[in-house]
Curated annotation (Swiss-Prot):
This is UPF0259 membrane protein YciC. Residues 41-86, 141-151, 210-224 are periplasmic. The keyword Methyltransferase does not apply. It is found in: Cell inner membrane. It comes from Escherichia coli O6:H1 (strain CFT073 / ATCC 700928 / UPEC). Belongs to the UPF0259 family. Keywords: Cell inner membrane, Cell membrane, Membrane, Transmembrane, Transmembrane helix. It is a multi-pass membrane protein. Residues 1-19, 108-117, 173-186, 246-247 are cytoplasmic. Its main location: membrane. The keyword Transmembrane applies.
Length: 247
């Protein structure tokens, strides 16, 4: 059977509309979890204020130069802030991926579903999803730091891994290998969706500062919720595409 991107887009749009409230609640809940965890593990405001003390920002030629000019205490604060942001984001993304994929599975099986039920049902696979998303994020970030293009290619090749991990109960590395092979064979169907997702995420990041006009916390929750909705659309598309490819 010939698969067209247009038909998968249409199926994705229909599912997203029909399950919008459930997906919105999961996106909001994951955003709240991300913001709360980030706040709990981040350095205090007083510690963050120390990052500006005695650091010649204008004279620094780059990020590494800026970090080298920091005191050991400032470097530790920066590391803690970065780790808190990364950890909270990974937790939120793992719960989002697990919840959205379980929604699709439950709805496809004709069962009634709620946001909490989907998240609860995904609990057993969350540790593997966390490791998978961590490794994927690491590889993509390394690729982007090198010349950008390798990072984008890795994001495309590993896009199907979360779906395969949950749907076929694969291991972390098996799902990554299988995703690379399957995506490479269906690049014309996967690449446009992932590139659109990356573009939407980038645009959201550019306008994220405007959300802080409310309060930093509410703005962060709103920005993360929108980001999660964008990721949910991609997950729905990838799940539908994967099921069609397997037929």
């Amino acid at each position: 059977m010939s698969i067209t991107a247009q038909s998968v887009y249409r199926d994705t749009g229909n599912f997203f509309r029909n399950q919008f409230m459930t997906i919105l609640l999961i996106s909001l809940l994951c955003a709240f979890i991300t913001v709360v965890l980030g706040h709990v593990f981040s350095p205090s405001d007083a510690q963050l204020a120390q990052l500006n003390d005695g650091v010649p920002v204008s004279g620094s030629s780059g990020l590494f130069d800026l970090v080298q000019n920091m005191s050991p205490e400032q470097q530790q604060i920066l590391l803690q802030a970065s780790a808190a942001s990364t950890f909270s984001g990974l937790i939120g993304n793992a719960i989002l991926a697990g919840g959205v994929i379980l929604i699709i599975q439950l709805v496809s099986a004709g069962q009634r579903v709620s946001a909490l039920r989907a998240i609860g049902a995904s609990a057993p696979i969350l540790p593997k999803l966390f490791i998978l998303i961590f490794l994927t994020t690491l590889l993509v970030q390394i690729g982007i730091m090198l010349v950008v293009v390798p990072g984008i290619i890795m994001a495309i090749l590993l896009a199907l891994a979360p779906v395969m991990l949950v749907q076929d109960k694969m291991g972390v590395f098996a799902s990554m290998r299988s995703s690379m092979r399957l995506t490479w064979a269906n690049m014309r169907l996967v690449a446009p969706a992932v590139l659109s997702w990356l573009l939407a995420k980038t645009l959201l990041l550019l306008f994220a500062s405007s959300f802080a006009a409310l309060t930093p916390e509410i703005g962060a929750v709103l920005a993360n919720t929108l980001s999660n909705l964008i990721s949910a659309v991609l997950l729905i598309y990838l799940f539908r595409l994967y099921m069609l490819i397997r037929q």
